């Protein structure tokens, strides 16, 4: 089952046109706001969220729990080599965790079935899928029955952040809901 969905402004705009994405988001066990635009829209509509939950922070906290609980984690997505680097850097910072496996986000249908089998056979408890919106959400949804009970979440470009390929905004910008401006500056 898709355990959680991190929803930002881009995803909300896309799901108005993409009915499959809208369906997936409406059937996640947990949907959390990832972006100042979502918080602002909630305020305007009278729905106040306690806080923004940045994908990078959320994934890091889930991984810390996985370290403590010894949950096997599978990293799926990113460019070749990115997931491995993200795993290495996280391990250097927080200690080793059970790795169910990893695969980049580039694969064909034959490889796809091998990946699903690897996720299952590795005893995966946490599946981080970083293939970008809406591909990651749809992929997780389309494979949820095959994958069985696993905390699966789309994490977008989080592997690049974890690997050190993409810097996050300074903390003061994040605290003032300006991370979007920093990302726009870095990736116009």
Language model region names:
Residues 104-110, 150-186:
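Short, flexible loop segments at boundaries between secondary-structure elements
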Residues 20-41, 48:
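Active-site cofactor/substrate anionic-group-binding motifs, chiefly glycine-
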Residues 39-118, 122:
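Conserved beta-alpha
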Residues 23-27, 137-157:
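A short, gly/pro- and small-residue-rich
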Residues 1-8, 12-13:
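Single conserved hydrophobic/aromatic residue that forms the stacking wall/gate
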Residues 29, 73, 100, 125, ...:
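Conserved acidic residues
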Residues 9-10, 131-136, 158:
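Short glycine-rich anion-binding loops that position phosphate/pyrophosphate groups of nucleotides
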Residues 119, 123-133, 149:
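Proline-aspartate-enriched helix->loop->beta-strand connector
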């Amino acid at each position: 089952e898709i355990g959680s969905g991190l929803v930002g402004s881009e995803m909300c705009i896309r799901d108005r046109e993409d009915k499959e994405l809208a369906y997936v988001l409406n059937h996640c066990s947990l949907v959390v706001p990832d972006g100042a635009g979502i918080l602002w829209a909630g305020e305007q509509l009278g729905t106040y969220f306690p806080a923004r939950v940045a994908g990078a922070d959320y994934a890091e906290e889930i991984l810390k729990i996985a370290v403590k609980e010894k949950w096997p984690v599978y990293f799926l997505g990113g460019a070749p080599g990115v997931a491995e680097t993200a795993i290495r850097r996280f391990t250097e910072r927080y200690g080793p965790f059970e790795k169910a496996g990893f695969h980049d986000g580039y694969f064909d249908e034959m490889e796809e079935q091998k990946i699903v089998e690897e996720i299952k056979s590795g005893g995966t408890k946490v599946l981080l899928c970083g293939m970008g919106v809406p591909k990651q959400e749809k992929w997780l949804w389309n494979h949820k029955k095959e994958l069985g009970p696993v905390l699966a979440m789309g994490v977008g470009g989080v592997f690049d952040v974890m690997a050190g390929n993409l810097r996050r905004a300074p903390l003061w910008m994040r605290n003032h809901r300006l991370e979007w401006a920093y990302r726009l500056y870095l990736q116009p």
